[in-house]
């Protein structure tokens, strides 16, 4: 009888064990100093995996969480200029509305959205700007956010896929 109980316990313990596997869209988290301002970006990096992304998986004209899984986050240690608007120091969600020739980029005040906020609230947009798209010579397998052209007065945030 003890042996039988032991087998049941052993079976229960092994059936409850979870096999941990890598995320399909791994999290990226980095900090960059630009001038005297610390910028931190956290996002998930979806992969193409043979899929058509723009205009298909991510439809044109729809708001996108700008990554996968949870919404992408950006924080600034100091006030920054986004386009022609001052964005206060703090943490924001990054959302985008892709189109073929340009993207609308939104810095959204609510950061605990776990994806797209429901409902979308225009009054929570802290800043937005429209940027032109450029074709890359080599597509990237993984969606990438980077901070480039860094100098003491500013930098560019690049979204590439």
Which functions belong to the PLM regions below?
Residues 1-20:
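Bacterial Sec-dependent N-terminal signal peptides
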Residues 18-59, 111-161:
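Primarily secretory-pathway and cell-envelope proteins
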Residues 55-71:
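Aromatic- and Gly/Pro-rich amphipathic surface segment
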């Amino acid at each position: 009888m003890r042996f039988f109980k032991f087998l049941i316990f052993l079976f229960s313990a092994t059936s409850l064990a979870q096999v941990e596997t890598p995320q399909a869209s791994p999290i990226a988290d980095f900090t960059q100093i630009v001038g005297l301002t610390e910028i931190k970006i956290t996002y998930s990096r979806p992969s193409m995996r043979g899929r058509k992304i723009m205009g298909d998986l991510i439809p044109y004209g729809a708001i996108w969480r700008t990554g996968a899984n949870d919404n992408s986050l950006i924080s600034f240690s100091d006030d920054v200029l986004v386009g022609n608007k001052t964005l206060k120091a703090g943490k924001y969600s990054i959302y985008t509305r892709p189109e073929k020739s340009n993207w609308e980029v939104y810095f959204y005040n609510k950061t605990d959205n776990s994806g797209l906020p429901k409902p979308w609230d225009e009054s929570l947009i802290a800043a937005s700007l429209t940027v032109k798209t450029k074709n890359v010579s080599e597509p990237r397998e993984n969606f990438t956010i980077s901070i480039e052209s860094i100098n003491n007065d500013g930098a560019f945030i690049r979204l590439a896929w």
